[in-house]
């Protein structure tokens, strides 16, 4: 029930992670459906993506990715599910950061994103869905800002989808 240090978050961290998870579905952005194992990994990533957020931690995604495999292995999840969830937690900010902070039309940027996801199109689909769910669960939306940090908007959807498409083409 910790408040977030980021002013973009309206909800406490635990409430935000539940909000994110509630927005995840079986439909992939590429038009398919997640099988049970991929969907399970996506839901697990949703409920734990901000688990690394705590005082004095500079990179909460890396910190979370350090804890996730330990937790999920202890809970008895299959190695693939653990690996996918770990990658998603580690990279849950990457798609949005690349779309807004780099040139999404630069082939080297698309290749870097593809490399981070092991050239796995299903992981890219899952990352897109996690990114969209995370961005739309912040509390700030288009036209509403909290200290000038925006949540999910049509503009953000468009540029993130462009980065997603470029990375998919690089795979």
Regions found by a protein language model. Give the residues of each.
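Beta-strand segments within the central parallel beta-sheet cores of soluble alpha/beta enzyme folds
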Residues: 80-90
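Amphipathic alpha-helical scaffolding segments
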Residues: 1, 62-63
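Divalent metal-dependent phosphate-bond-processing catalytic cores, especially two-metal-ion Mg2+/Mn2+ enzymes
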Residues: 7-14, 18-39, 44, 48, ...
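Alpha-helical segment that forms one wall of the substrate-binding/catalytic cleft
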Residues: 64-68
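Non-catalytic interface/linker regions that flank or bridge core catalytic/transmembrane domains
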Residues: 1-7
């Amino acid at each position: 029930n910790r408040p977030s240090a980021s002013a973009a978050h309206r909800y406490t961290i635990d409430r935000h992670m539940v909000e994110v998870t509630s927005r995840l579905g079986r439909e992939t952005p590429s038009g398919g459906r997640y099988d049970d194992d991929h969907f399970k990994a996506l839901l697990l990533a949703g409920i734990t993506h901000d688990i690394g957020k705590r005082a004095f931690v500079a990179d909460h995604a890396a910190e979370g990715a350090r804890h996730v495999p330990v937790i999920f292995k202890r809970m008895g999840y299959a190695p693939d599910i653990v690996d996918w969830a770990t990658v998603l937690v580690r990279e849950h900010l990457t798609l949005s950061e690349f779309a807004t902070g780099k040139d999404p039309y630069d082939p080297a940027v698309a290749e870097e994103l593809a490399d981070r996801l092991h050239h796995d199109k299903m992981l890219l689909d899952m990352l897109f869905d996690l990114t969209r769910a995370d961005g739309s669960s912040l509390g700030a939306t288009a036209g509403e800002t909290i200290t000038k940090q925006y949540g999910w908007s049509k503009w953000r959807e468009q540029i993130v989808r462009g980065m997603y498409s470029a990375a998919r083409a690089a795979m």
